Swiss-Prot record:
It comes from Archaeoglobus fulgidus (strain ATCC 49558 / DSM 4304 / JCM 9628 / NBRC 100126 / VC-16). The keyword Methyltransferase does not apply. Its cofactor is dipyrromethane. It holds the Pfam family Porphobil_deam. GO terms for biological process: protoporphyrinogen IX biosynthetic process. The porphobilinogen subunits are added to the dipyrromethane group. PROSITE patterns: PORPHOBILINOGEN_DEAM (PS00533). This is Probable porphobilinogen deaminase.
């Protein structure tokens, strides 16, 4: 049986898709098909301005729903709660690093950056979190693939940039670039960072069920439960991180109208439901309902 696997065309997206494709090849003949998305076409637009439309997702899932591809591979953090009708995330593979990292032009850490240093990031969450640690920092928008971001840093457009460690590692750049990783307790990552999701049409989930990593799936669902009940996207600075061990450790951080941080240990059996309640409570406290 042959599966056509849909993906974005960036180096990072292809690296993620190849990781999935190698596993699919254990059972299927695999063809990779590139689909352009809004996020690829409008490269100068900050992601928070896309407002929940799924800048890197919708075109892929539409191709899936229309039968142009059989499977779509996503970075799960980009997948909105509202999906293209007829599609479903059917599996996730084991999570890569959820952490954000700082890469500076001269090897400085966050603490060592000069006063008023310029940090490249378009993420409102990263800006808000870094400002709490270093209120003197200045921020400039930064989009593009990792190679582009690193080139702009080297050219002197920024003193430092912040990116996801998972992306560096998937492209093998972690061996070439010196960086400072931020533990999730310090810079709480966005929900589902470091997780690769595999989507299928509804009713065809069994095609990829053998790929699913249960620990990562639980972490993903807990984080998404919080975000869904909060009712926010990347236009609001929110970090949510879950780590499943004997219990599920959950950290939520909101930096909007006021600062709120919650840390809880949840039972595995009821973690998703408990996380949803936490999301509801946080929404009430910040937005009044």
């Amino acid at each position: 049986m042959k599966l056509i696997v849909g993906t974005r065309g960036s180096k990072l997206a292809l690296a993620q898709t190849n990781k999935v494709a190698e596993r699919l090849k254990e059972r299927y003949e695999v063809e990779i098909r590139i689909v352009k998305t809004a996020g690829d076409i409008m490269k100068d637009k900050p992601l928070y301005e896309f407002k929940g439309m799924g800048a890197f997702v919708r075109a892929l899932d539409t191709a899936l729903a229309e039968g142009k591809v059989d499977v779509a591979v996503h970075s799960f953090k980009d997948v909105p709660s509202q999906r293209v009708e007829g599609t479903v995330v059917a599996a996730v593979i084991e999570r890569d690093s959820p952490c954000d990292v700082l890469i500076s032009r001269d090897g400085s850490t966050l603490e060592e950056l000069d006063e008023g240093a310029v940090v490249g990031t378009s993420s409102l969450r990263r800006r808000a979190q870094l400002s709490r640690l270093r209120g003197d920092l200045r921020f400039e928008n930064l989009r593009g693939n990792l190679d582009t971001r690193l080139r702009k840093l080297r050219e002197g457009n920024y003193d430092a940039i912040v990116v996801a460690e998972a992306g560096l590692k998937r492209l093998g750049l972690d061996r070439e670039v010196e960086y400072q990783p931020f533990p999730p307790e310090v810079i709480v990552p966005p929900a589902n960072q470091g997780i690769i999701a595999i989507a299928t049409r509804k009713g065809e989930e069994d095609l990829v069920a053998f790929l699913n990593d249960e620990k990562t799936w639980l972490e993903a669902m807990v984080e998404r439960a919080v975000i869904k009940e909060l009712g926010v996207g990347c236009a609001v600075p929110v970090g949510v991180y879950a780590e499943a061990q004997s219990r599920v450790r959950l950290i939520c951080e909101i930096l909007d109208k006021k600062y709120l941080r919650v840390e809880e240990k949840l039972s595995k059996d009821t973690a998703v439901e408990e996380a949803a309640e936490i999301g509801k409570d946080l929404r009430k406290e910040i937005y009044g309902g």
